[in-house]
Amino acid sequence: MVNYPHQLKGKKANPTPFKTKKSTVDFANRGMSFEAAINATNDYYLSRGIAVIHKKPTPIQIVKVDYPKRSRAKIVEAYFRQASTTDYSGVYKGLYIDFEAKETRQKTAMPMKNFHLHQIEHMASVLDQKGICFVLLHFSTLKETYYLPAKALIDFFQIDKGNKSMPLDYIKKNGYEIIQGAFPQVPYLDIIEQNFLGGDYN
């Protein structure tokens, strides 16, 4: 039985969506990938003392190592291993932040093949410890980005494991659209503040 954080107990994931003026800024038009935009956002938060959130390194399986010199080793063959948890983690206002980021070119749904059981289990464990856990979902063709609480993702995964994709309508109903900005590009802390903490990080 997963005990979700107190911020999510007894309330729908999207009771009063936080709305801001629609921005015309699009990080893709500036030659940035979704991941790069998130990293730039985290750098912005860090440089201003707002939050400390970093991308977790991708685990690597080393297969072959050469030793051209006794004092120097050279990796000549290695493979990326499947990540065991999520993409990002850190601290904001004393709260543990943990999230995954996914992107798709589809217009109506997010492929569930992008999520693995061990990631779902990790998110549930974070919620058990009262952490703030969520996924950032970017629809590149639509140029839309959403914050979906981990609870909503876990519920969908548990109820409809055989479904090949999560409908955009479900994401809109249970999540929050993130309005892209110039600085930061993906202001996801705005969603946390306005909908879960009820404050302002500025």
UniProtKB/Swiss-Prot annotation:
GO molecular function: endonuclease activity; magnesium ion binding; nucleic acid binding
Any GO CC annotation of this UniProt entry: cytoplasm
Ranges in a coiled coil: none
CDD domains from the UniProt entry: RecU-like
Keywords from the UniProt entry: Cytoplasm, DNA damage, DNA recombination, DNA repair, Endonuclease, Hydrolase, Magnesium, Metal-binding, Nuclease
InterPro entries attached to this UniProt entry: Resolv_RecU, Restrct_endonuc-II-like, tRNA_endonuc-like_dom_sf
Reactions that this protein is recorded to catalyse: Endonucleolytic cleavage at a junction such as a reciprocal single-stranded crossover between two homologous DNA duplexes (Holliday junction)
Role, per record: Endonuclease that resolves Holliday junction intermediates in genetic recombination. Cleaves mobile four-strand junctions by introducing symmetrical nicks in paired strands. Promotes annealing of linear ssDNA with homologous dsDNA. Required for DNA repair, homologous recombination and chromosome segregation.
Family recorded in the similarity comment: Belongs to the RecU family.
NCBIfam families: PRK02234.1-1, PRK02234.1-5, recU
Family matches, as HAMAP family: RecU
Official protein name in the record: Holliday junction resolvase RecU
Biological classification of the source: Bacteria, Bacillati, Bacillota, Bacilli, Lactobacillales
Gene, per the UniProt record: recU
